[in-house]
């Protein structure tokens, strides 16, 4: 490993009280810690220079605690990209970090467990010195591997250093049934033995993922899927903080904070976490889906990838995003779905993307320059929803009917929320003197705008529904079309209008 790093990386942060170093001027601080701009060239390259710089070695748990306290004290959000946990999960995680605990996150799929864990690297110091060439990030002040011990003993203060960025101090393993002790802890390297080394030589060891994350954070995802005999191999890591490899008479002390994630159903369906291992995790934190639809809308806006097409503007009105989120919340309440499996936020994200894609396809085909999702585009959600829910139904033919019922319930709920009830009667009465309105993929946005202009009550409802969407001016015809469809479909679901579906479109009429 090289003793120097590219100048684009920020300088190290000494730990001694009153001694600070910082990042280059083109790097914006992200951890809320006070920094002083110091040239990258001042970073020590030898053990002797490191001692003179006043750097102090601290355990990883203490490093997390210190930086978490600084983040809390500064008032910055601990995990700015994780939304909806500010009053529930994050306070528990902050307590666990301050207590120096290993943590297991328990929750259904799509609850940001892995994202939370990966975000913890932001609480590590930007740079960490190691003995150059070490496979397990040996501390220059207290090396533990045979290689690093011998090197420091031979070179003393002239021992060369390497610097590891915080992002490289995180290790992760997805637990699978074929995961072995060699993968996690280590094994004797037969190639090194073939080169002439003795089996008793510690240098023949090939370290696994856990020791290679020494002085860092290690996460095991889907922990119950790890076979029980392999889970036993982690007991020493969590309690005694050491590992033993094969028949070698070594106990390699490690400085690593362990994290794990698991789904609640895994305890009974696919596997279990052995009791001694659960007992060794200091904190167990239960995650959850967003409790507030507005928070889930923010998550969808943050995560969804909306298609970008030259010459086409894509606008997703707030009421359609609200319908997308309402579908997920309705699904989480449905007795026809397996709630133990959960309804992931990923479904909301995928539905938003599918809805926007359907609008883009329609706009490109019709030659329009603005693409806005409509209620009729919700048919595209069948594909994005199908793999993200588990339906508890003996009759597979009812799957489509159940999902359609969920979508209709979500639509009706949003309609009642965003369109005031006093506006409903005026639109219905106007339809008594109107032949009806046709909607669908083949109907251009201009036709909807003409319909709205010809029915004053509908124009009023559309204006109220769009609110700030029009930015104070006349809204685009595509936006009006989306609002018209929501109003008409809402009145139909409220049993105020009839809907006749034929081919690629539908027609709304007054109820007989």
Please tell me what each predicted stretch does.
Residues 34-68:
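Interdomain "pre-motor" coupling segment immediately N-terminal to P-loop NTPase/helicase cores
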Residues 124-162, 167-209, 214-312, 354-366:
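Canonical AAA+ ATPase core
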Residues 112-113:
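Conserved glycine(s) of the Walker
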Residues 54-66, 268-272, 278-341, 363-367, ...:
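Conserved C-terminal "switch" segment of AAA+ ATPases
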Residues 116, 120:
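Hydrophobic positions on the alpha1 helix immediately C-terminal to the Walker A/P-loop
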């Amino acid at each position: 490993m090289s003793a120097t790093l590219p100048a684009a990386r920020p300088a190290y942060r000494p730990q001694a009280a009153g001694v600070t170093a910082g990042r280059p001027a083109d790097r914006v601080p992200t951890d809320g810690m006070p920094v002083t701009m110091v040239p990258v060239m001042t970073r020590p390259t030898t053990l002797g220079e490191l001692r003179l710089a006043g750097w102090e070695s601290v355990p990883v748990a203490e490093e997390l605690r210190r930086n978490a306290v600084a983040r809390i004290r500064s008032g910055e959000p601990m995990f700015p990209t994780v939304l909806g946990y500010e009053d529930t999960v994050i306070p528990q995680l902050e307590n666990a970090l301050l207590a120096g605990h290993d943590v297991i996150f328990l929750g259904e799929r799509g609850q940001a467990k892995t994202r939370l864990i990966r975000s913890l690297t932001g609480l590590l110091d930007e740079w960490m010195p190691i003995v150059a060439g070490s496979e397990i990030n040996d501390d220059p002040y207290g090396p533990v591997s045979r290689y690093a011990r011998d090197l420091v003993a031979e070179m003393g203060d002239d021992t060369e250093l390497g610097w590891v960025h915080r992002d490289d101090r995180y290790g992760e393993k997805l637990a699978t049934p074929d995961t072995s002790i060699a993968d996690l802890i280590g094994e004797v390297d037969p190639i090194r033995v073939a080169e002439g080394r003795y089996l008793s030589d510690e240098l023949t060891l090939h370290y696994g993922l856990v020791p290679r994350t020494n002085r860092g954070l290690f996460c095991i995802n889907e922990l119950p899927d790890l076979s029980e005999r392999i889970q036993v191999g982690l007991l020493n890591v969590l309690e005694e903080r050491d590992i033993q490899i094969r028949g070698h008479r070594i106990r390699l002390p490690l400085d690593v904070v362990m994290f794990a994630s698991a789904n609640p159903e895994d305890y009974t369906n696919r596997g279990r976490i052995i009791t001694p291992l659960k007992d060794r995790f200091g904190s167990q934190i239960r995650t959850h889906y967003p409790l507030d639809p507005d928070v889930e809308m923010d998550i969808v806006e943050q995560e969804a990838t909306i298609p970008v097409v030259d010459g086409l503007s894509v606008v997703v009105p707030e009421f359609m995003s609200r319908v997308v989120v309402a579908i997920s919340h309705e699904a989480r309440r449905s007795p026809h779905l397996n709630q133990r499996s959960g309804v992931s936020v990923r479904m909301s994200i995928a539905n938003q993307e599918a809805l926007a894609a359907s609008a883009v396809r329609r706009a490109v085909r019709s030659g329009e320059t603005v693409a806005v999702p409509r209620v009729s585009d919700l048919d595209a959600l069948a594909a994005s929803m199908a793999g993200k829910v588990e339906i508890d139904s003996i009759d597979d033919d009812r799957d489509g009917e159940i999902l359609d019922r969920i979508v209709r319930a979500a639509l009706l709920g949003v309609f009642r929320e965003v369109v005031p009830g006093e506006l409903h009667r005026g639109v219905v009465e106007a339809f008594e003197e109107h032949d009806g309105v046709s909607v669908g993929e083949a109907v251009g946005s201009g036709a909807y705008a003409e319909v709205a202009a010809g029915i004053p009550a509908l124009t009023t409802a559309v204006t109220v529904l769009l609110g700030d969407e029009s930015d104070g001016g006349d809204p685009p015809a595509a936006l009006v079309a989306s609002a018209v469809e929501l109003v008409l479909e809402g009145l139909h679901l409220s049993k105020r209008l009839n809907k006749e579906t034929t081919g690629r479109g539908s027609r709304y009429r007054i109820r007989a």
